[in-house]
């Protein structure tokens, strides 16, 4: 796998293709970042972008993880003391999950977001941005019917973080797309380059296959989950014999979250996936690619129950180091 393939593997979108290709031609010394609100224990959404950071490190990038304590405060996630304590725990979990500690810089937002220059640049961006545009950028991230003034400033800070961190590539889930497009539009107004961005897919709710997996509603997987928790959640997961399920009766689109987690979490981290089965049911199945596993689920060779058993096992292997770190 060459640098371009590793950088773009499992990406839902890159902006722009030409900019990513140029980085792939000479990735050494390039820097990518993801920002995370330190608002809780790592869950499968954090792990999806962390997988991409691991890919980027293997491609030659240096990585910055922004533990966005000021953002979390503006988003009403607790006091600074509480948020910073959570940030320290999250840092340790990211390392336990597999980020290369020697090649990862962890930065608190408050290390630079309270400086005079940053504040003045932020005010300049406020002058360039309508409230409606800021609300649209924030709508995919926050919940609730109304946006507070602090939350409207939030996406402008995300845009400004990119040049202040000195990064070449902004990484986030598809819910960050509007923020990154806002950044491309407004940063040139303060003589900063429009950022290159890479967006990871959104995984559907584990129980229903609808919407997106969320730590605030529905069913998700986190580093607090025991092996038994993981097995229970995965066993109850929605898993039809196809990667492209029919929509619900009321027209909502659905995905197969079991296959999504195999594709975006398991296969990027394991060269081979073994599905254990008793000899009386044909013995073990072994896959060296996601496509092969998907094809055998659709053909009937792989039963959904056996796929779920394997998924729970590999998820537990990924999560166990972080779970052990949390227990210390």
Swiss-Prot record:
Quaternary data: Homodimer.
The protein's Enzyme Commission number: 6.1.1.1
Pfam family, one: tRNA-synt_1b
Protein name, UniProt field: Tyrosine--tRNA ligase
Motif annotated as 'KMSKS' region, chain positions: 212-216
Catalytic reaction equation(s): tRNA(Tyr) + L-tyrosine + ATP = L-tyrosyl-tRNA(Tyr) + AMP + diphosphate + H(+)
Binding site for ATP: 215
Gene, per the UniProt record: tyrS
Binding site for L-tyrosine: 33, 154, 158, 161, 176
Subcellular location(s) of the protein: Cytoplasm
Motif ('HIGH' region): 38-46
Gene Ontology terms, MF aspect: ATP binding; tyrosine-tRNA ligase activity
Domain of life of the source: Archaea
Source organism (scientific name): Halorubrum lacusprofundi (strain ATCC 49239 / DSM 5036 / JCM 8891 / ACAM 34)
GO CC terms: cytoplasm
InterPro entries attached to this UniProt entry: aa-tRNA-synth_I_CS, aa-tRNA-synth_Ic, Rossmann-like_a/b/a_fold, Tyr-tRNA-ligase, Tyr-tRNA-ligase_3, Tyr-tRNA-ligase_arc/euk-type, Tyr-tRNA_synthase
Function in brief: Catalyzes the attachment of tyrosine to tRNA(Tyr) in a two-step reaction: tyrosine is first activated by ATP to form Tyr-AMP and then transferred to the acceptor end of tRNA(Tyr).
Keywords recorded for this protein, A-Z: Aminoacyl-tRNA synthetase, ATP-binding, Cytoplasm, Ligase, Nucleotide-binding, Protein biosynthesis
